[in-house]
Structure formats: structure tokens, C-alpha cells
Swiss-Prot record:
InterPro entries: Enolpyruvate_Tfrase_dom, Enolpyruvate_Tfrase_sf, EPSP_synthase, EPSP_synthase_CS, RNA3'P_cycl/enolpyr_Trfase_a/b. The lineage of its organism: Bacteria, Pseudomonadati, Pseudomonadota, Gammaproteobacteria, Vibrionales. It is found in: Cytoplasm. This is 3-phosphoshikimate 1-carboxyvinyltransferase. Coiled coil: none annotated. Its EC number is 2.5.1.19.
Length: 428
């Protein structure tokens, strides 16, 4: 297996223009495909998850042109749901942002579809979404294990009416149903069962739907009403915001070993909840400055904090490695959904943090981290999880090197991450 050893970094300084957001890129691609008219998407993320979505759209008869650097995509919208005259199998890798929304969108049209992916995808639950789609009349069967992909869909359209969605595991199930709902056969009401996790990701979905001409009534995240007779219409141009989760590594690096780092492509008006990572860093002692389309982080004396991170689960992982540089104990709470991401992130983070010397308590939905006096050089296993690889790069901001196994797994969201980090780093 390939590995990369990062030597100790004395200081970080500079500016990073963020790659496009994965969450925004795949939502916008899907809506552009369903919309009437042509959409020009700019700052699209070039990564595995986006490629899986684009490959699926090609198989579904969508025409698009991708620029040489793959960050501009012109999509000719179908102006209707997807149809297939012969059975189509779509391989979606480990891309939850493609699997869940496509599972819902494919129920709208006509045809037979099989959705499958990598072995890890077959361990990521989808039952709550399938239950809701079945309530709306969808014909879906599990081809291997109950509640998990691969799925076989016999599409005949989605009925109007009320459906129930369990919101306690992942907000992607609700996102998927919301995006399909305007093309159902009438008004749709979605009732949320349990406490909805990761609400800011729902805000992203609603914001993008609005840009494509669809209004949704949001009753305090307990009920969503999608009035009948709406359809998606291209906004013409669509700018994909920088990935706020990806910003977290650079903002944290500056807080630990700045100088200062300016991150561009997101700002105080960002639609992504993960920009609130900067607020958590500020609470820990970093100096943060907000602009319209940038955030600056400067070094501070960091102290451990005890916080609920349900609203920013992806960026919260970065807090776990930032905690290695803070005085005292850091508690990351209410992040059960780490367990159903690219890997079981609670277990993985606890295991790898202990390797570098931290004392860690892993609970069902929390992590408590006590930093060591001195970090230990370790080979970090990344579990084919892009965020674990990027989080643990921060260990090099000490006087200890760190080895990252399978560093190319960052291609899921940030293919040139390690090059970017190196360009901002002054080695010890």
C-alpha cells in the first residue's frame, strides 16, 4: 500500500482557493439534469463522487460538456424525469451524495434501474429512504441485504400525499426525497420522525432547489410541504461554493501553527453549515476574520472545549485532531452519524488518535480527547476515508512526523490536498 510521510511543519501561511463543495456539486448536477434548459455549473468539484454522478447521468441519457480541468460543466437538462427502455445498472462507488438522491429521483420516471457500489457502500444504510419511497408507491427491492444497497427500482412515478421519513440517522435521506418530490404526481408532505440530524445540509438542499425554481414550505424541520405543479427550471448559471468541510483543515492548521491562512470560495453568507467550524475554532482560541467570500484564521493559544457538533458532523472530525494541540480536554458530542459515513468514523478516529498518543474515550455518539505531552510518530490507517487522511495531516504541525497510509483516498473530495498543504508549509 502506498503511504506518505509528512515531516514536521514549523509554520503555515498563505491563501487557499477551495475546490467546489461535494454536497453542492452533486445536488446541482442532478437538478440541472432534471431541469428545463441548459445550466452552466462553475467551480464544480473534480473528484470520485462527482465522476460517479456524471457517469450515471450519461447512462441516463443526459448530455453535458466538461471543461479540460473538469471544473466547468454545461448540462443540457431533460426537463422531465429519467426514463429507460432497457434495464440500467449504475455503479456509484462509495458516493452517498449520488446513491441516495438518485435512488429517489429514479422512482419518478419509467424503467428498471439497479443501483450498486463499492463494498463499503453496501454497508451504508438506505432503509429509511426506501421506506419513505415505498410509502409513495415506489417499487424497490433489496438485491443483497435488507436496508442496504444494491437496490433494484421499477420506476412508475411517485404518488402525491404524506410520507414519513426517519431523520435520526442521516439527512441525506430527506435531501433525496425533497429533490424528487416536486416531480411527484401532486402535493407531497414529508413528516419527520425523530430528531433531524445535520439540519444545515437540508438548508443546502432547499437553497439549491430554490435556485432551480422550486419552493418548499419548511415547518420547523418537522414537516416539509412541496406544493403541486412545480418543475425545475435552469437558472442558466450556477456557481458551486467552495467546500466548507475542506476549509476546516487549513483554518485549523493556521490556528495551530500560523501565520495566517486565508481561505477563499466561502464566506459569511455561505449556504454550508460547515462554515461554523470556524466558530468552534474561535471558541478554542483561534483568531477568525470573516469576509463576503473568504475566512482568515490566525494562530491562537488553543484550549479544549465541550460542544455539540450535530450541525457540522464532517468538519467536527477536524476538531478531534486539533484537540491534540489544545490545553485540556476536548469533547465532541452528538455525532452518532459519524458511524454511517465513509467508514465508522467514531471508531476509526478513536483508534488513530490513540496511535499518536492521545487518551480517548469513545461513546456511542461522542468522543473525548485528552492530548499527550508529546505526539508519537505513527502510520495512520485511513479506511478509504478522505476526511481521516486530511484530519491526521495536522499531526505534522508538531515536532513529530506523521505517516498517512493510502493518501490518494482524498480524491473523493480534494485530489490535490497534500500538494496544497505543502505549498503553505514551512518545514521545521
Amino acid at each position: 500500500m502506498e503511504s506518505l510521510t509528512l515531516q514536521p511543519i514549523k509554520k503555515v501561511n498563505g491563501e487557499v482557493n477551495l475546490p467546489g463543495s461535494k454536497s453542492v456539486s452533486n445536488r446541482a448536477l442532478l437538478l440541472a439534469a432534471l431541469a428545463k434548459g441548459t445550466t452552466r455549473l462553475t467551480n464544480l468539484l473534480d473528484s470520485d463522487d462527482i465522476r460517479h454522478m456524471l457517469n450515471a447521468l450519461t447512462k441516463l441519457g443526459v448530455h453535458y460538456e466538461l471543461s479540460a480541468d473538469k471544473t466547468v460543466c454545461v448540462v443540457e437538462g431533460l426537463g422531465r424525469p429519467f426514463t429507460a427502455t432497457e434495464a440500467q445498472e449504475l455503479f456509484l462507488g462509495n458516493a452517498g451524495t449520488a446513491m441516495r438522491p438518485l435512488a429517489a429521483a429514479l422512482c419518478l420516471g419509467k424503467g428498471e434501474f439497479v443501483l450498486t457500489g463499492e463494498p463499503r457502500m453496501k454497508e451504508r444504510p438506505i432503509g429509511h429512504l426506501v421506506d419513505a419511497l415505498r410509502e409513495a408507491g415506489a417499487q424497490i427491492e433489496y438485491l443483497e441485504n435488507e436496508n442496504y444497497p444494491p437496490l433494484k427500482i421499477n420506476a412508475t412515478g411517485l404518488q402525491a400525499g404524506t410520507v414519513n421519513i426517519d431523520g435520526s440517522i442521516s439527512s441525506q435521506f430527506l435531501t433525496a426525497f425533497l429533490m424528487a418530490a416536486p416531480l411527484a404526481q401532486g402535493e407531497v408532505k414529508i413528516h419527520i420522525v425523530g430528531e433531524l440530524v445535520s439540519k444545515p445540509y437540508i438548508d443546502i438542499t432547499l437553497h439549491i432547489m430554490k435556485q432551480f425554481g422550486v419552493d418548499v414550505v419548511n415547518n420547523a424541520y418537522q414537516e416539509f410541504i412541496i406544493p403541486a405543479g412545480q418543475s425545475y427550471v435552469s437558472p442558466g448559471q450556477f456557481l458551486v461554493e467552495g467546500d466548507a468541510s475542506s476549509a476546516s483543515y487549513f483554518l485549523a492548521a493556521a490556528a495551530i501553527k500560523g501565520g495566517e491562512i486565508k481561505v477563499t470560495g466561502i464566506g459569511k453568507n455561505s449556504i454550508q453549515g460547515d462554515i461554523h467550524f470556524a466558530d468552534a475554532l474561535e471558541k478554542m482560541g483561534a483568531e477568525i476574520e470573516w469576509g463576503e467570500d473568504y475566512v482568515i484564521s490566525r494562530v491562537g493559544r488553543l484550549k479544549g472545549i465541550d460542544m455539540d457538533y450535530n450541525h457540522i458532523p464532517d468538519a467536527a472530525m477536524t476538531i478531534a485532531t486539533t484537540a491534540l494541540f489544545a490545553q485540556g480536554t476536548t469533547a465532541i458530542r452528538n455525532v452518532y452519524n459519524w458511524r454511517v459515513k465513509e467508514t465508522d468514523r467514531l471508531s476509526a478516529m478513536a483508534t488513530e488518535l490513540r496511535k499518536v498518543g492521545a487518551e480517548v474515550e469513545e461513546g456511542e455518539d461522542y468522543l473525548i480527547v485528552n492530548p499527550p505531552q508529546q505526539l508519537t510518530h505513527a502510520a495512520i490507517d485511513t479506511y478509504d476515508d478522505h476526511r481521516i487522511a486530511m484530519c491526521f495531516s495536522l499531526v505534522a504541525l508538531s515536532d513529530t512526523p506523521v505517516t498517512i497510509n493510502d493518501p490518494k483516498c482524498t480524491s473523493k473530495t480534494f485530489p490535490d490536498y497534500f500538494d496544497k498543504l505543502a505549498s503553505l508549509s514551512e518545514l521545521a
